[in-house]
Amino acid sequence: MAKHRYLPMTEQDEKEMLDVIGVKSIDDLFQDIPEKIRFKRDYDLKPAKSEPALLRELSKLASKNANTSEYASFLGAGVYSHYIPTVVDHVISRSEFYTAYTPYQPEISQGELQAIFEFQTMIAELTGMDLANSSMYDGGTALAEAAMLASGHTKRKKILISGAVHPESSNVLKTYATGQHIEVEVIPELDGKTDIEALKKALSDDIAGFVAQYPNFYGQVEPLAELEKLVHENNSLLLVSSNPLSLGLLTPPGEFGADIVVGDSQVFGIPESFGGPHCGFFAVTNKLMRKVPGRLVGETVDENGKRGYVLTLQAREQHIRRDKATSNICSNQALNALASSVAMATLGKTGLVEMAKQNLDKSHYAKQKFREKGFEVLFSDGFFNEFVVKLSKPIKEVNKSLLDEGIIGGYDLGFYEEKYKHHMLVAVTEMRTKEEIDAFVASLEGAK
């Protein structure tokens, strides 16, 4: 008989397995773990509950969370509250799509491969690049992989990154760089954008690439044309991390001459989910095609001349080349990429532009209301859907008060930068109404 209800292994099965590997007991398998830190007690689990009782308890726990369908959220900083068309969940819940993995058998996976191909196509069009891969873990890892590509392509071991790039993405890059013995230098931010003079001084023959964010962490739109000229005159690569929704209005980075464009497609069809899982994208020019990390789906024809889709250029990948691969990324975010594909296809080009325009208009309306009420709003008016407001009280304290009023406040910039203590990064998406924006501004009057 099996010792555990849901584990089919019997005591005899266990004994035979231990005999094969020459071990007397299960405990011997953990002999490398010091005796004093091994867990030997029984788990203090509550008695089993019926399904209705369990659902009640889980619902009670879930109700402690602030749900953005019930609260007016002005929180962004990389993860945003956007409308998700109902059709998205319907499509991704279909059994033939319900996996995070890229299909290796094209004969039985044409639907999923075509959906991934469409994702690549739409991302390439949005970013103005020649091609995009099937997805990455998230925007941060996509940025780090871009830096690794730049270093490998240029044979240089130093990356410059703007201080106006999201701090979490910057930290992911630094983690990657440590293992690859790549030096990362942060170019300071000045008035919410990259300090151009500091960048000029930092550029040298050992610089593989420069990383900018567009729009950046503070919501500002970086001068990509000027950055591109400086970086390419140094024979370095220009890497741009971008919010793909903003590209419904802004000039795509590819048109400025960016070599690699990365970001997160969470803004299309993917819920906030406490910060993940989301879906990174990675787009490049043709000259870097064979150095792209992750999966690439290509269009071809079968022996009957019919259109088909396959994984292509696989010699780059770790399941083929192992330690010589362009990257060791393995499973990707195929299911979330599908969600973004469905959302983008549902919006269409006109709908995407309208969604981006609502973000722009509503955030600028909010900024104007703050100024009318006497708040100090930092930096220029050249932003997409985020801006910085200075308050007189700690942001943590302010946000706690806002939550009691049914409002999720903006991001506390002082968490990363002491000079931005008492500064709130406010995000305004198409989900917010005029009444909610007015109420938000009014609620902050006491913290002006």
Curated annotation (Swiss-Prot):
Protein keywords: Oxidoreductase
Catalytic activity: N(6)-[(R)-lipoyl]-L-lysyl-[glycine-cleavage complex H protein] + glycine + H(+) = N(6)-[(R)-S(8)-aminomethyldihydrolipoyl]-L-lysyl-[glycine-cleavage complex H protein] + CO2
Enzyme class, spelled out: oxidoreductase
EC number: 1.4.4.2
Molecular function, one GO term: glycine dehydrogenase (decarboxylating) activity
InterPro entries: GcvPA, GDC-P_N, GDC_P, PyrdxlP-dep_Trfase, PyrdxlP-dep_Trfase_major, PyrdxlP-dep_Trfase_small
Highest rank taxon of the organism: Bacteria
One GO BP: nucleoside metabolic process
Pfam families for this protein: GDC-P
Stated role: The glycine cleavage system catalyzes the degradation of glycine. The P protein binds the alpha-amino group of glycine through its pyridoxal phosphate cofactor; CO(2) is released and the remaining methylamine moiety is then transferred to the lipoamide cofactor of the H protein.
Known partners and oligomeric status: The glycine cleavage system is composed of four proteins: P, T, L and H. In this organism, the P 'protein' is a heterodimer of two subunits.
Record-stated family: Belongs to the GcvP family. N-terminal subunit subfamily.
HAMAP family associated with the record: GcvPA (MF_00712)
UniProt-recorded name of the protein: Probable glycine dehydrogenase (decarboxylating) subunit 1
Organism per entry: Listeria monocytogenes serovar 1/2a (strain ATCC BAA-679 / EGD-e)
Gene name linked to the record: gcvPA
